[in-house]
């Protein structure tokens, strides 16, 4: 299992200059590879990132000698990222989604570079972590604000510049010590903008709305930035101040989501959530800011990877299932609007619509889980017995590559 720990760095002035230079090399290599990919494709060729890496290696000593000032990993991993960007682009095209053609990178926007370690049996590694220091290629030992949390082999280090300084994201290959599956009960979770999460057992998690809380300050700093002369030192200071505020808002949101998803993944074995169409919901002009402030997509991402580590199962309910409109008592479907906060049914049930939806999500998740288990049981029962000789042949064929 690959786990990533992002840690703030305390580089010296010289190391900070090196980081900026390495980010520039990475950005240049990415833009060069993207332009070359487009040129070859328009000429009728079939470009690929491996060929582009070889092409750059052949010409960089003569045409780009300044690349030798930083680790060779910076341009190489940048070109790999171009290949990944096109993989995602073609995947979205096949799925009929908005493709999002890869774009050129600008200076000062998400500056980063990556250094990869070699194979596990290599005698030396480009990236090494000891206590609160990390050794990076061509840079030396850099101090970290905290020690690495995970034990295992460090596969790579991605150094990036945030609004408040430099960070390193360490990817660590750890042992697959997953928590044994236990029956900790099931829960349905309904997400919303007024109340972030409502559990089927009645527990609620209020929405922090960090962006709304800091909106006035964002407006004030944005107006101050607009009044500054372009290229001036005061404009750079105002821009950095605004960026730090945006980073703080994002961190407050992410921290709240981490606490919520950790609670769910550790306290329940079956978690039902809805397959929300977040991109479609963001088209609602009156609710777009509140929906973006809640972080629904980040909630699902965190919950799914944490559930794997705790042995829980996340069951995603179809987005068209009328969880809010269906009475959790008798199953009658009602026509209600977003203004209706209470569901009243002829059967006598009168309940908060979010709690009613969470109960329905839990019930639907358990039903889907039961169907899945029956299907797996039927599939295992239909498997024909295999001879000992056949098993020996299969052992040699099934080589794990993941």
Residue ranges with predicted function:
Residues 1-402:
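Nucleic-acid substrate recognition interfaces
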């Amino acid at each position: 299992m690959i786990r990533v720990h992002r840690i703030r760095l305390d580089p010296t002035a010289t190391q900070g200059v090196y980081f900026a230079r390495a980010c520039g090399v990475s950005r240049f290599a990415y833009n060069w590879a993207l332009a070359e990919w487009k040129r070859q494709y328009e000429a009728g060729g079939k470009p690929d990132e491996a060929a582009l890496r070889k092409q750059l290696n052949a010409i960089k000593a003569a045409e780009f000698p300044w690349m030798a000032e930083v680790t060779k990993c910076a341009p190489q991993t940048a070109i790999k990222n171009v290949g990944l960007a096109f993989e995602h682009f073609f995947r979205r095209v096949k799925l009929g989604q908005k493709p999002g053609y890869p774009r050129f990178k600008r200076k000062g926007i998400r500056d980063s570079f990556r250094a990869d370690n070699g194979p596990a049996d290599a005698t030396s590694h480009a990236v090494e972590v000891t206590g609160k220091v990390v050794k990076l290629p061509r840079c030396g030992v850099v101090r970290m604000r905290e020690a690495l949390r995970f034990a295992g082999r460090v596969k790579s280090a991605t150094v990036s510049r945030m609004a408040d300084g430099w960070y390193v994201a360490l990817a660590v290959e750890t042992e697959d010590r997953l928590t044994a599956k236990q029956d900790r009960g099931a829960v349905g979770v309904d997400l919303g903008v007024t109340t972030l999460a409502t559990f089927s057992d009645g527990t609620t998690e209020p929405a922090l709305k960090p962006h709304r809380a800091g909106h006035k300050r964002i407006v004030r700093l944005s107006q101050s930035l607009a009044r500054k002369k372009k290229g001036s030192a005061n404009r750079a200071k105002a821009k950095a101040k605004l960026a730090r505020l945006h980073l703080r808002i994002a961190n407050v949101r992410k921290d709240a989501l981490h606490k919520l998803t950790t609670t769910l993944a550790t306290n329940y074995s079956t978690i039902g959530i809805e397959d929300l169409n977040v991109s479609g919901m963001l088209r609602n002009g009156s609710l777009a800011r509140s929906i973006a402030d809640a972080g629904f997509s980040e909630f699902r991402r965190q919950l799914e990877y944490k559930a794997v580590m705790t042995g829980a199962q996340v069951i995603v309910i179809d987005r068209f299932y009328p969880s809010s409109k269906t009475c959790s008592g008798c199953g009658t479907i009602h026509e209600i609007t977003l203004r209706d906060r209470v569901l009243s049914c002829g059967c006598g049930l009168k309940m908060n619509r979010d709690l009613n939806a969470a109960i329905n999500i839990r019930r639907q998740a358990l039903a889907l889980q039961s169907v899945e288990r029956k299907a797996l049981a039927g599939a295992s029962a239909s498997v024909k017995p295999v001879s000992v000789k056949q098993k020996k042949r299969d052992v040699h064929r099934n080589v794990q590559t993941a």
